[in-house]
């Protein structure tokens, strides 16, 4: 097991997007604009669905015909087994935006995993807390593997990965629901930077401190955060 991790500086990174089926996907358009402007990117890879307006990328189609969790697992398994993909890459969702210049991408967590689980179980105690249940199963597996006090890395930020280590993580959790980020980062002890998540759920004013933002469908289309992102990255990228 790798213990301790530093990500090398002064280099370019392969950016891997997992992309849902959406022929328009304006979030992806602006995410890529933000990457081209602010992130040390070498190549952009698209796993999943590729809108027709997107060009100058490396595309790996993945059929997504299941629910959210099974689709995610299929995408990650495809990435992990893609021998043509460099071992080191940075994983993006299509609703991640790089708002400031980044030289070296880091791992991000917001505290202990058990605290996040307890919060979710309390918040959703009167309904089925599926996500909390998934996180608890991952927490229990980490405990079985001797990893005490694991951190919560399930945030909406770009995340550096080793493809081979991703593959090992998926093998060790193949009987569990999907929560790859927290298992991977704790099992391989990547360390990182502690801070709050950057996901914006409010349509109005928002307060996010840091180099990244993430939106949902409504906040990107209708919210102040979406207007700010579109205004900041108003010029087409070389991938349009």
Q: Locations of the language-model features?
A:
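N-terminal anchoring/stem segment of glycosyltransferases
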Residues: 1-66, 190-191, 208-240
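Catalytic core and acceptor-binding pocket of nucleotide-sugar-dependent glycosyltransferases
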Residues: 129-220
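Membrane-interface amphipathic segments in extracytoplasmic regions
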Residues: 4, 17, 71-77, 110, ...
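Conserved donor-nucleotide/metal-binding helix-loop-beta segment in metal-dependent transferases, i.e.
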Residues: 100-131
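Aromatic-acidic/polar surface patches that form glycan- and anion
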Residues: 20-28, 68-72, 120, 124-134, ...
């Amino acid at each position: 097991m790798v213990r301790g991790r530093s990500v090398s500086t002064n280099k370019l990174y392969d950016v891997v997007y997992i992309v849902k089926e959406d022929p328009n996907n304006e979030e992806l358009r602006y995410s890529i604009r933000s990457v081209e402007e602010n992130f040390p990117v070498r190549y952009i890879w698209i796993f999943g669905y590729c809108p027709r307006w997107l060009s100058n990328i490396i595309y790996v189609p993945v059929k997504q015909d299941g629910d959210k969790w099974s689709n995610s697992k299929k995408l990650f398994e495809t990435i992990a087994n893609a021998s043509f993909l460099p071992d080191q890459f940075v994983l993006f969702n299509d609703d991640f935006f790089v708002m400031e210049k980044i030289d070296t991408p880091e791992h991000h967590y917001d505290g202990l995993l058990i605290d996040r689980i307890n919060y979710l179980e309390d918040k959703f105690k009167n309904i089925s807390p599926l996500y909390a249940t998934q996180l608890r199963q991952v927490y229990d597996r980490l405990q079985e593997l001797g990893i005490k006090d694991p951190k919560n890395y399930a945030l909406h930020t770009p995340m550096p990965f080793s493809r081979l280590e991703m593959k090992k993580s998926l093998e060790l959790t193949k009987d569990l629901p999907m929560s790859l980020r927290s298992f991977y980062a704790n099992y391989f002890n990547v360390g990182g930077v502690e801070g709050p998540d950057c996901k914006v759920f409010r349509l109005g004013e928002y307060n996010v401190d840091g180099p990244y933002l993430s939106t949902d469908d409504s906040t990107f289309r209708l919210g102040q955060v979406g207007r700010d992102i579109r205004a900041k990255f108003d010029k087409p990228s070389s991938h349009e």
